[in-house]
Amino acid sequence: MSTNQIPLTDQGDNYVNVWSYVAQDLYNHYGETLYNSWFSKVNFIESSLNTVILCAPTNFIRDWIKSKYAMVILQLFQHYNNAIKSIEIITKELPGTTQAVIESPTKTFADIGNSALNSENIVSTLDVRFTFDNFVVGVPNELAYAAARAVAESSGAVFESNPLFLYGGVGLGKTHLMHAIGWYIKQNNPRRKVIYMSAEKFMYQFVKALRNKEVILFKEKFRSVDVLMIDDIQFICGKDSTQEEFFHTFNTLIDNNRQMVISCDRSPSDLDNIEDRIKSRLGWGLVADVHSTTYELRLGILESKIEQMNVKIPKDVINFLASKIVSNVRELEGALNKVIAHSNFTLKAITLENTQNILRDLLRSNERIITVEDIQKKVASRYNIKLSDMYSSRRLREVARPRQIAMYLSKTLTPKSLADIGKKFGKKDHTTVMHAIKKVEELLENDIELREEINLLMKILQN
Protein backbone atom coordinates (compact mmCIF):
# COMPACT_ATOMS: atom_id res chain seq x y z
CA MET A 1 0.00 0.00 0.00
CA SER A 2 1.09 3.55 -0.60
CA THR A 3 2.16 5.50 2.46
CA ASN A 4 1.16 8.88 0.97
CA GLN A 5 -1.45 10.76 2.98
CA ILE A 6 -4.25 12.05 0.75
CA PRO A 7 -5.90 15.24 2.05
CA LEU A 8 -9.67 15.12 2.34
CA THR A 9 -9.90 18.88 2.24
CA ASP A 10 -9.24 18.85 -1.51
CA GLN A 11 -11.84 18.42 -4.23
CA GLY A 12 -14.40 15.62 -4.02
CA ASP A 13 -12.49 13.56 -6.55
CA ASN A 14 -9.88 12.88 -3.88
CA TYR A 15 -12.52 11.21 -1.71
CA VAL A 16 -13.26 8.81 -4.52
CA ASN A 17 -9.53 8.22 -5.00
CA VAL A 18 -9.12 7.17 -1.38
CA TRP A 19 -11.99 4.68 -1.68
CA SER A 20 -10.48 3.27 -4.88
CA TYR A 21 -7.21 2.64 -2.99
CA VAL A 22 -9.07 1.09 -0.06
CA ALA A 23 -11.11 -1.10 -2.42
CA GLN A 24 -7.93 -2.31 -4.12
CA ASP A 25 -6.43 -3.14 -0.71
CA LEU A 26 -9.57 -5.11 0.20
CA TYR A 27 -9.31 -7.02 -3.07
CA ASN A 28 -5.62 -7.78 -2.52
CA HIS A 29 -6.14 -8.87 1.08
CA TYR A 30 -9.35 -10.90 0.85
CA GLY A 31 -9.17 -12.17 -2.74
CA GLU A 32 -11.56 -12.02 -5.69
CA THR A 33 -14.31 -14.28 -4.32
CA LEU A 34 -14.87 -12.44 -1.05
CA TYR A 35 -14.34 -9.01 -2.65
CA ASN A 36 -16.99 -9.65 -5.29
CA SER A 37 -19.39 -10.97 -2.65
CA TRP A 38 -19.23 -7.95 -0.32
CA PHE A 39 -17.31 -4.92 -1.58
CA SER A 40 -17.58 -4.72 -5.37
CA LYS A 41 -20.93 -2.87 -5.35
CA VAL A 42 -20.14 -0.53 -2.45
CA ASN A 43 -19.73 3.11 -3.54
CA PHE A 44 -18.31 6.24 -1.99
CA ILE A 45 -21.03 8.85 -1.34
CA GLU A 46 -19.50 11.78 0.52
CA SER A 47 -17.34 12.90 3.43
CA SER A 48 -18.86 14.82 6.31
CA LEU A 49 -16.36 16.34 8.75
CA ASN A 50 -14.13 13.37 9.69
CA THR A 51 -16.62 10.72 8.62
CA VAL A 52 -16.59 8.87 5.31
CA ILE A 53 -20.00 7.76 4.04
CA LEU A 54 -20.26 4.65 1.87
CA CYS A 55 -23.34 3.22 0.19
CA ALA A 56 -24.08 -0.53 0.07
CA PRO A 57 -26.56 -1.95 -2.45
CA THR A 58 -28.70 -3.75 0.16
CA ASN A 59 -29.37 -3.68 3.89
CA PHE A 60 -28.08 -7.23 4.09
CA ILE A 61 -24.66 -6.35 2.63
CA ARG A 62 -24.55 -3.16 4.70
CA ASP A 63 -25.20 -5.00 7.97
CA TRP A 64 -22.70 -7.78 7.19
CA ILE A 65 -19.92 -5.33 6.30
CA LYS A 66 -20.65 -3.33 9.45
CA SER A 67 -20.41 -6.41 11.66
CA LYS A 68 -17.39 -8.05 10.01
CA TYR A 69 -15.29 -5.52 8.12
CA ALA A 70 -16.05 -1.98 9.35
CA MET A 71 -12.91 -1.72 11.50
CA VAL A 72 -10.68 -3.03 8.71
CA ILE A 73 -12.14 -0.50 6.25
CA LEU A 74 -11.67 2.34 8.75
CA GLN A 75 -8.04 1.37 9.34
CA LEU A 76 -7.40 1.29 5.59
CA PHE A 77 -8.93 4.75 5.18
CA GLN A 78 -6.79 6.03 8.04
CA HIS A 79 -3.71 4.60 6.37
CA TYR A 80 -4.25 7.08 3.55
CA ASN A 81 -5.56 9.93 5.71
CA ASN A 82 -5.38 9.83 9.50
CA ALA A 83 -7.91 12.66 9.81
CA ILE A 84 -10.67 10.14 9.14
CA LYS A 85 -12.19 9.10 12.46
CA SER A 86 -15.19 7.02 11.42
CA ILE A 87 -17.07 5.51 8.52
CA GLU A 88 -20.80 5.25 7.97
CA ILE A 89 -22.40 2.70 5.66
CA ILE A 90 -25.86 3.46 4.34
CA THR A 91 -28.26 2.11 1.74
CA LYS A 92 -30.34 4.09 -0.70
CA GLU A 93 -33.61 2.45 -1.61
CA LEU A 94 -34.80 2.76 -5.17
CA PRO A 95 -37.94 4.88 -5.69
CA GLY A 96 -41.09 2.97 -4.91
CA THR A 97 -39.42 0.15 -2.99
CA THR A 98 -40.72 -0.83 0.40
CA GLN A 99 -39.85 -3.38 3.03
CA ALA A 100 -41.95 -6.45 2.40
CA VAL A 101 -43.75 -7.88 5.41
CA ILE A 102 -45.37 -11.30 5.41
CA GLU A 103 -48.97 -11.39 6.44
CA SER A 104 -50.60 -14.40 8.03
CA PRO A 105 -51.86 -17.00 5.55
CA THR A 106 -55.52 -16.61 4.64
CA LYS A 107 -58.10 -18.68 6.42
CA THR A 108 -58.86 -20.55 3.23
CA PHE A 109 -55.29 -21.83 3.06
CA ALA A 110 -55.09 -22.47 6.79
CA ASP A 111 -58.20 -24.60 6.64
CA ILE A 112 -56.43 -27.27 4.61
CA GLY A 113 -54.09 -28.08 7.50
CA ASN A 114 -55.80 -31.42 8.14
CA SER A 115 -55.58 -32.59 4.54
CA ALA A 116 -53.62 -35.81 4.00
CA LEU A 117 -51.67 -33.98 1.33
CA ASN A 118 -50.58 -31.38 3.87
CA SER A 119 -50.00 -33.64 6.86
CA GLU A 120 -46.19 -33.74 6.82
CA ASN A 121 -44.38 -31.90 9.58
CA ILE A 122 -41.44 -29.68 8.62
CA VAL A 123 -39.47 -30.94 11.64
CA SER A 124 -39.72 -34.53 10.44
CA THR A 125 -37.92 -33.61 7.22
CA LEU A 126 -35.05 -31.74 8.90
CA ASP A 127 -31.76 -33.35 9.92
CA VAL A 128 -30.84 -32.55 13.54
CA ARG A 129 -27.15 -32.45 12.57
CA PHE A 130 -27.61 -29.49 10.24
CA THR A 131 -27.87 -26.27 12.23
CA PHE A 132 -26.14 -22.89 12.04
CA ASP A 133 -24.25 -23.68 15.24
CA ASN A 134 -22.31 -26.54 13.68
CA PHE A 135 -21.81 -25.01 10.24
CA VAL A 136 -18.15 -24.09 9.82
CA VAL A 137 -17.78 -20.77 8.00
CA GLY A 138 -14.88 -19.94 5.68
CA VAL A 139 -14.19 -17.81 2.62
CA PRO A 140 -15.78 -20.34 0.19
CA ASN A 141 -19.17 -20.32 1.95
CA GLU A 142 -19.30 -17.01 3.83
CA LEU A 143 -21.78 -15.27 1.52
CA ALA A 144 -24.11 -18.28 1.41
CA TYR A 145 -23.98 -18.61 5.21
CA ALA A 146 -24.66 -14.93 5.83
CA ALA A 147 -27.58 -14.91 3.40
CA ALA A 148 -29.08 -18.08 4.87
CA ARG A 149 -28.76 -16.60 8.34
CA ALA A 150 -30.46 -13.39 7.20
CA VAL A 151 -33.38 -15.38 5.75
CA ALA A 152 -33.78 -17.35 8.97
CA GLU A 153 -33.62 -14.27 11.20
CA SER A 154 -36.01 -12.17 9.11
CA SER A 155 -38.82 -12.65 11.69
CA GLY A 156 -41.71 -12.46 9.26
CA ALA A 157 -40.21 -10.05 6.74
CA VAL A 158 -38.94 -11.31 3.41
CA PHE A 159 -35.18 -11.24 2.88
CA GLU A 160 -34.54 -8.30 0.57
CA SER A 161 -33.00 -10.52 -2.14
CA ASN A 162 -35.75 -13.02 -2.90
CA PRO A 163 -35.30 -15.82 -3.86
CA LEU A 164 -32.06 -16.91 -2.24
CA PHE A 165 -30.37 -19.23 -4.74
CA LEU A 166 -27.53 -21.40 -3.40
CA TYR A 167 -25.41 -23.34 -5.87
CA GLY A 168 -22.26 -25.43 -5.83
CA GLY A 169 -20.95 -28.97 -6.08
CA VAL A 170 -22.09 -32.01 -4.13
CA GLY A 171 -21.35 -32.10 -0.40
CA LEU A 172 -20.33 -28.45 0.05
CA GLY A 173 -23.03 -27.40 2.53
CA LYS A 174 -26.06 -26.20 0.54
CA THR A 175 -28.46 -28.71 2.10
CA HIS A 176 -26.94 -28.05 5.54
CA LEU A 177 -27.80 -24.35 5.22
CA MET A 178 -31.37 -25.05 4.11
CA HIS A 179 -31.95 -27.38 7.06
CA ALA A 180 -30.39 -24.76 9.34
CA ILE A 181 -32.87 -22.15 8.07
CA GLY A 182 -35.73 -24.53 8.81
CA TRP A 183 -34.53 -25.35 12.32
CA TYR A 184 -33.94 -21.72 13.21
CA ILE A 185 -37.39 -20.62 12.08
CA LYS A 186 -39.19 -23.47 13.85
CA GLN A 187 -37.30 -22.78 17.09
CA ASN A 188 -37.58 -18.99 17.04
CA ASN A 189 -40.75 -18.30 15.07
CA PRO A 190 -42.77 -21.54 15.16
CA ARG A 191 -45.95 -19.93 13.81
CA ARG A 192 -44.34 -19.40 10.42
CA LYS A 193 -45.22 -22.11 7.94
CA VAL A 194 -42.14 -23.66 6.32
CA ILE A 195 -41.77 -26.40 3.73
CA TYR A 196 -38.44 -27.97 2.84
CA MET A 197 -38.21 -30.71 0.23
CA SER A 198 -36.21 -31.89 -2.73
CA ALA A 199 -37.27 -30.98 -6.26
CA GLU A 200 -37.68 -34.70 -6.89
CA LYS A 201 -40.21 -35.01 -4.07
CA PHE A 202 -41.98 -31.87 -5.29
CA MET A 203 -42.42 -33.55 -8.68
CA TYR A 204 -43.62 -36.85 -7.20
CA GLN A 205 -46.19 -35.08 -5.01
CA PHE A 206 -47.39 -33.12 -8.03
CA VAL A 207 -47.77 -36.32 -10.09
CA LYS A 208 -49.61 -37.97 -7.20
CA ALA A 209 -51.93 -34.97 -6.91
CA LEU A 210 -52.72 -35.22 -10.63
CA ARG A 211 -53.45 -38.93 -10.31
CA ASN A 212 -55.65 -38.48 -7.22
CA LYS A 213 -57.34 -35.33 -8.56
CA GLU A 214 -55.99 -33.28 -5.65
CA VAL A 215 -54.29 -30.56 -7.69
CA ILE A 216 -56.16 -27.78 -5.88
CA LEU A 217 -54.96 -29.09 -2.52
CA PHE A 218 -51.43 -29.35 -3.90
CA LYS A 219 -51.51 -25.74 -5.07
CA GLU A 220 -52.91 -24.52 -1.76
CA LYS A 221 -50.31 -26.44 0.21
CA PHE A 222 -47.31 -24.92 -1.54
CA ARG A 223 -48.74 -21.47 -2.17
CA SER A 224 -49.82 -20.81 1.42
CA VAL A 225 -46.41 -21.15 3.07
CA ASP A 226 -44.25 -18.39 4.53
CA VAL A 227 -41.00 -20.05 3.44
CA LEU A 228 -40.60 -22.60 0.65
CA MET A 229 -37.21 -24.33 0.27
CA ILE A 230 -36.61 -26.57 -2.75
CA ASP A 231 -33.37 -28.58 -2.85
CA ASP A 232 -31.65 -29.68 -6.09
CA ILE A 233 -33.86 -27.71 -8.47
CA GLN A 234 -31.88 -29.11 -11.42
CA PHE A 235 -34.04 -32.24 -11.07
CA ILE A 236 -36.97 -30.54 -12.83
CA CYS A 237 -34.89 -29.81 -15.95
CA GLY A 238 -36.64 -31.41 -18.92
CA LYS A 239 -39.84 -32.07 -16.94
CA ASP A 240 -42.28 -29.66 -18.57
CA SER A 241 -45.40 -30.19 -16.44
CA THR A 242 -43.46 -29.90 -13.18
CA GLN A 243 -41.74 -26.76 -14.47
CA GLU A 244 -45.11 -25.22 -15.29
CA GLU A 245 -46.43 -25.87 -11.78
CA PHE A 246 -43.20 -24.65 -10.17
CA PHE A 247 -43.33 -21.46 -12.26
CA HIS A 248 -46.82 -20.56 -11.04
CA THR A 249 -45.99 -21.51 -7.45
CA PHE A 250 -42.89 -19.31 -7.63
CA ASN A 251 -44.86 -16.34 -8.98
CA THR A 252 -47.60 -16.69 -6.38
CA LEU A 253 -45.16 -16.78 -3.48
CA ILE A 254 -43.02 -13.90 -4.71
CA ASP A 255 -46.09 -11.77 -5.49
CA ASN A 256 -47.40 -12.40 -1.96
CA ASN A 257 -44.06 -11.55 -0.31
CA ARG A 258 -43.27 -15.11 0.71
CA GLN A 259 -39.67 -16.29 0.99
CA MET A 260 -38.13 -18.82 -1.39
CA VAL A 261 -34.80 -20.61 -1.00
CA ILE A 262 -33.54 -22.74 -3.89
CA SER A 263 -30.44 -24.93 -4.18
CA CYS A 264 -28.81 -26.28 -7.30
CA ASP A 265 -25.58 -27.84 -8.52
CA ARG A 266 -25.01 -24.97 -10.98
CA SER A 267 -25.91 -21.31 -11.45
CA PRO A 268 -29.29 -20.35 -12.97
CA SER A 269 -27.65 -19.29 -16.23
CA ASP A 270 -26.03 -22.73 -16.60
CA LEU A 271 -29.26 -24.73 -16.29
CA ASP A 272 -30.23 -26.62 -19.45
CA ASN A 273 -33.66 -27.90 -20.52
CA ILE A 274 -35.45 -25.41 -18.33
CA GLU A 275 -37.72 -22.59 -19.48
CA ASP A 276 -36.08 -19.19 -19.86
CA ARG A 277 -38.79 -17.56 -17.76
CA ILE A 278 -37.91 -19.87 -14.85
CA LYS A 279 -34.18 -19.39 -15.36
CA SER A 280 -34.70 -15.63 -15.27
CA ARG A 281 -36.74 -15.72 -12.07
CA LEU A 282 -34.25 -17.95 -10.25
CA GLY A 283 -31.68 -15.20 -10.73
CA TRP A 284 -33.94 -12.40 -9.47
CA GLY A 285 -32.62 -12.41 -5.93
CA LEU A 286 -29.25 -13.24 -4.41
CA VAL A 287 -27.28 -15.97 -6.20
CA ALA A 288 -24.63 -17.33 -3.81
CA ASP A 289 -21.93 -19.74 -4.96
CA VAL A 290 -20.75 -22.27 -2.37
CA HIS A 291 -17.17 -22.79 -3.52
CA SER A 292 -14.97 -25.84 -3.09
CA THR A 293 -13.41 -26.06 0.36
CA THR A 294 -10.01 -24.61 1.14
CA TYR A 295 -7.45 -26.45 3.25
CA GLU A 296 -8.20 -24.07 6.15
CA LEU A 297 -11.94 -24.69 5.91
CA ARG A 298 -11.45 -28.47 5.78
CA LEU A 299 -9.23 -28.20 8.84
CA GLY A 300 -11.91 -26.19 10.65
CA ILE A 301 -14.62 -28.69 9.70
CA LEU A 302 -12.55 -31.60 11.00
CA GLU A 303 -11.72 -29.84 14.27
CA SER A 304 -15.38 -28.92 14.80
CA LYS A 305 -16.51 -32.48 14.09
CA ILE A 306 -13.86 -33.94 16.39
CA GLU A 307 -14.92 -31.59 19.18
CA GLN A 308 -18.58 -32.58 18.74
CA MET A 309 -17.67 -36.27 18.89
CA ASN A 310 -15.41 -35.71 21.91
CA VAL A 311 -12.55 -37.79 20.54
CA LYS A 312 -8.81 -37.22 20.36
CA ILE A 313 -7.15 -37.29 16.95
CA PRO A 314 -3.41 -36.67 16.43
CA LYS A 315 -2.60 -33.42 14.64
CA ASP A 316 -0.74 -35.17 11.81
CA VAL A 317 -3.83 -37.29 11.09
CA ILE A 318 -6.06 -34.20 10.96
CA ASN A 319 -3.62 -32.45 8.62
CA PHE A 320 -3.45 -35.57 6.44
CA LEU A 321 -7.23 -35.78 6.10
CA ALA A 322 -7.53 -32.05 5.34
CA SER A 323 -4.89 -32.23 2.63
CA LYS A 324 -5.91 -35.51 1.00
CA ILE A 325 -9.73 -35.57 1.12
CA VAL A 326 -10.40 -32.50 -0.99
CA SER A 327 -13.49 -33.38 -3.03
CA ASN A 328 -16.27 -32.33 -0.64
CA VAL A 329 -17.32 -32.06 3.00
CA ARG A 330 -19.45 -35.20 2.89
CA GLU A 331 -16.50 -37.36 1.85
CA LEU A 332 -14.25 -35.62 4.38
CA GLU A 333 -16.61 -36.35 7.28
CA GLY A 334 -17.12 -39.89 6.01
CA ALA A 335 -13.37 -40.50 6.05
CA LEU A 336 -13.12 -39.17 9.61
CA ASN A 337 -16.03 -41.36 10.76
CA LYS A 338 -14.40 -44.41 9.16
CA VAL A 339 -11.10 -43.78 10.95
CA ILE A 340 -12.83 -43.32 14.32
CA ALA A 341 -15.08 -46.37 13.86
CA HIS A 342 -12.10 -48.55 12.92
CA SER A 343 -10.30 -47.46 16.08
CA ASN A 344 -13.36 -48.15 18.25
CA PHE A 345 -13.95 -51.62 16.83
CA THR A 346 -10.33 -52.80 16.68
CA LEU A 347 -9.11 -50.92 19.79
CA LYS A 348 -6.13 -49.73 17.74
CA ALA A 349 -4.74 -46.25 18.22
CA ILE A 350 -5.45 -43.63 15.58
CA THR A 351 -2.11 -43.02 13.90
CA LEU A 352 -1.09 -41.61 10.54
CA GLU A 353 0.01 -45.04 9.33
CA ASN A 354 -3.26 -46.69 10.38
CA THR A 355 -5.25 -43.87 8.79
CA GLN A 356 -3.42 -44.30 5.48
CA ASN A 357 -4.17 -48.03 5.53
CA ILE A 358 -7.84 -47.57 6.46
CA LEU A 359 -8.40 -45.05 3.67
CA ARG A 360 -6.17 -46.69 1.06
CA ASP A 361 -9.08 -47.46 -1.30
CA LEU A 362 -10.26 -43.85 -1.19
CA LEU A 363 -6.72 -42.57 -1.71
CA ARG A 364 -6.15 -44.98 -4.59
CA SER A 365 -9.34 -43.71 -6.19
CA ASN A 366 -7.96 -40.19 -6.04
CA GLU A 367 -4.68 -41.41 -7.52
CA ARG A 368 -6.49 -42.96 -10.48
CA ILE A 369 -8.23 -39.69 -11.18
CA ILE A 370 -5.32 -37.25 -10.85
CA THR A 371 -1.76 -37.75 -12.07
CA VAL A 372 1.32 -35.54 -11.95
CA GLU A 373 1.05 -35.20 -15.73
CA ASP A 374 -2.54 -33.94 -15.39
CA ILE A 375 -1.39 -31.35 -12.88
CA GLN A 376 1.49 -30.17 -15.05
CA LYS A 377 -0.80 -29.70 -18.06
CA LYS A 378 -3.49 -27.81 -16.15
CA VAL A 379 -1.05 -25.52 -14.34
CA ALA A 380 0.90 -24.77 -17.53
CA SER A 381 -2.34 -23.93 -19.31
CA ARG A 382 -3.59 -21.82 -16.42
CA TYR A 383 -0.43 -19.70 -16.29
CA ASN A 384 0.07 -19.63 -20.07
CA ILE A 385 3.51 -21.24 -20.06
CA LYS A 386 4.89 -24.09 -22.13
CA LEU A 387 4.55 -27.62 -20.79
CA SER A 388 8.30 -27.98 -21.32
CA ASP A 389 8.81 -25.23 -18.71
CA MET A 390 7.63 -27.74 -16.11
CA TYR A 391 10.70 -29.86 -16.80
CA SER A 392 13.17 -26.98 -17.18
CA SER A 393 15.34 -25.23 -14.61
CA ARG A 394 14.45 -21.70 -15.70
CA ARG A 395 14.35 -19.35 -12.71
CA LEU A 396 12.18 -16.59 -14.16
CA ARG A 397 9.37 -15.96 -11.67
CA GLU A 398 6.63 -16.36 -14.29
CA VAL A 399 7.94 -19.90 -14.90
CA ALA A 400 9.33 -20.90 -11.51
CA ARG A 401 6.20 -20.03 -9.50
CA PRO A 402 3.78 -22.14 -11.62
CA ARG A 403 6.30 -25.00 -11.46
CA GLN A 404 6.39 -24.72 -7.64
CA ILE A 405 2.59 -24.70 -7.54
CA ALA A 406 2.49 -27.81 -9.73
CA MET A 407 4.91 -29.57 -7.36
CA TYR A 408 2.79 -28.53 -4.37
CA LEU A 409 -0.38 -29.85 -6.03
CA SER A 410 1.41 -33.07 -6.98
CA LYS A 411 2.26 -33.68 -3.33
CA THR A 412 -1.24 -32.69 -2.17
CA LEU A 413 -3.33 -34.54 -4.75
CA THR A 414 -1.25 -37.64 -5.47
CA PRO A 415 0.45 -40.22 -3.22
CA LYS A 416 3.75 -39.82 -5.05
CA SER A 417 6.93 -39.44 -2.99
CA LEU A 418 9.06 -36.31 -3.26
CA ALA A 419 11.62 -38.29 -5.26
CA ASP A 420 8.98 -39.56 -7.69
CA ILE A 421 7.58 -36.05 -8.13
CA GLY A 422 11.08 -34.72 -8.79
CA LYS A 423 11.57 -37.24 -11.59
CA LYS A 424 8.41 -35.98 -13.27
CA PHE A 425 9.78 -32.43 -13.23
CA GLY A 426 12.94 -32.98 -15.27
CA LYS A 427 14.71 -35.37 -12.89
CA LYS A 428 14.97 -32.86 -10.06
CA ASP A 429 15.99 -34.19 -6.63
CA HIS A 430 13.64 -34.41 -3.67
CA THR A 431 15.17 -31.37 -1.92
CA THR A 432 14.12 -29.16 -4.85
CA VAL A 433 10.56 -30.44 -4.56
CA MET A 434 10.62 -30.00 -0.78
CA HIS A 435 11.78 -26.39 -1.18
CA ALA A 436 9.01 -25.69 -3.72
CA ILE A 437 6.33 -27.14 -1.44
CA LYS A 438 7.61 -25.20 1.56
CA LYS A 439 7.69 -21.99 -0.47
CA VAL A 440 4.08 -22.38 -1.59
CA GLU A 441 2.94 -23.26 1.95
CA GLU A 442 4.59 -20.08 3.26
CA LEU A 443 2.87 -17.99 0.60
CA LEU A 444 -0.50 -19.57 1.35
CA GLU A 445 -0.38 -18.37 4.95
CA ASN A 446 -0.88 -14.74 3.89
CA ASP A 447 -1.74 -14.68 0.19
CA ILE A 448 -5.49 -15.19 -0.03
CA GLU A 449 -5.50 -14.64 -3.79
CA LEU A 450 -2.96 -17.46 -4.30
CA ARG A 451 -4.99 -19.67 -1.96
CA GLU A 452 -8.09 -19.15 -4.09
CA GLU A 453 -6.08 -19.76 -7.26
CA ILE A 454 -4.81 -23.10 -5.95
CA ASN A 455 -8.29 -24.09 -4.77
CA LEU A 456 -9.60 -23.31 -8.24
CA LEU A 457 -6.89 -25.49 -9.80
CA MET A 458 -7.84 -28.31 -7.41
CA LYS A 459 -11.48 -27.94 -8.42
CA ILE A 460 -10.55 -28.05 -12.12
CA LEU A 461 -8.38 -31.13 -11.63
CA GLN A 462 -10.98 -32.98 -9.58
CA ASN A 463 -13.69 -32.34 -12.16
Swiss-Prot record:
Region (Domain III, AAA+ region): 125-343
Domain of life: Bacteria
SMART domains in alphabetical order: AAA (SM00382), Bac_DnaA_C (SM00760)
SUPFAM superfamilies xrefs: P-loop containing nucleoside triphosphate hydrolases, TrpR-like
Keyword line: ATP-binding, Cytoplasm, DNA replication, DNA-binding, Lipid-binding, Nucleotide-binding
Region (Domain II): 84-124
Protein name per its UniProtKB record: Chromosomal replication initiator protein DnaA
Species the sequence originates in: Rickettsia prowazekii (strain Madrid E)
